[in-house]
């Protein structure tokens, strides 16, 4: 038996197919429709129904239909309702973590700080890997003098002009969250961090793409003086005597195509006391 969140997602799929017909490449629906369908199911946090950060969490009917969810945002104006869309070809919305070879694995002596494991938040993961020199060594190898500018988590809104493969996305103003940003000599790196979970073999690309697109559009418009934007995904896994930190650096070969994500490099740091 599935969770109430999964039941609501299945109900949304059935509702959209009944309304628009089978086989469509895109089904658009609103927050109001999500809320209305959530009431008989008893899923109170209807805003969470469209938050799917790994394909492992797709509902059974979404998997059967090959559908994933993207956020279309809200147009300007009082009373406008946020929109979302089911996109057929959910594989284009997720990226599988690459295997990290032994030659790209480093064991590092670890003297834990008193706050390293105080909580499991994304901010704590990023603080830990920065405090122990992992980010500087990974992003700027050989440059021991690199002192990047750090910008902490923030939320903002962007009207992203983009597509997913051949599907043009009719996005309005989308609220995005940037976990952290580093800038060094005109190169910007945006971050997403997660704790390891069983079954989390991939991630929703939009988590990296939306911050990337936010900065890239500002660069294109001449609003910021930078020349390169990359994306870093970090996964922390607690291990006996320390943690394994997997770090992946990505770019988008076509900045307007979310499906064009491409690995630059990856590395595992085995931190042991």
Task: Label each residue range with its predicted role.
Residues 144-184:
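Active-site metal-binding core of divalent-cation-utilizing nuclease and nuclease-like domains
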């Amino acid at each position: 038996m599935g969770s109430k969140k999964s039941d609501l997602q299945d109900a949304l799929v059935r509702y959209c197919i009944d309304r628009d017909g089978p086989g469509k490449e895109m089904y658009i629906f609103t927050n109001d429709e999500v809320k209305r369908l959530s009431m008989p199911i008893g899923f109170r946090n209807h805003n969470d129904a469209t938050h799917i950060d790994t394909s492992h969490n797709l509902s059974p009917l979404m998997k059967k239909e090959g559908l994933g969810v993207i956020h279309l945002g809200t147009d300007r104006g009082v009373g406008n309702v946020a929109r979302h869309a089911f996109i057929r070809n959910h594989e284009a919305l997720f990226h599988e973590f690459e295997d990290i070879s032994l030659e790209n694995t480093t064991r590092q002596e670890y003297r834990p700080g008193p706050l390293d494991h105080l909580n499991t938040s994304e901010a704590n993961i990023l603080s830990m890997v920065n405090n122990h020199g992992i980010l500087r060594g990974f992003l700027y190898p050989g440059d021991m003098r690199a002192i990047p500018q750090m910008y902490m988590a923030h939320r903002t809104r962007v009207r992203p002009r983009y597509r997913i493969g051949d599907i043009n996305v009719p996005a309005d103003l989308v609220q995005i969250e940037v976990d952290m940003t580093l800038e060094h000599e005109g190169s910007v790196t945006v971050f997403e961090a997660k704790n390891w979970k069983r079954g989390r073999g991939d991630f929703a690309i939009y988590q990296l793409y939306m911050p990337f697109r936010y900065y890239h559009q500002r660069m294109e418009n001449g609003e910021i003086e930078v020349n390169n934007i990359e994306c870093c995904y970090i996964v922390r896994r607690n291990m006996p005597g320390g943690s394994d930190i997997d770090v992946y650096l990505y770019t988008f070969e076509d900045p307007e195509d979310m499906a064009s994500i491409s690995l630059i490099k990856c590395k595992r740091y085995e931190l042991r006391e």
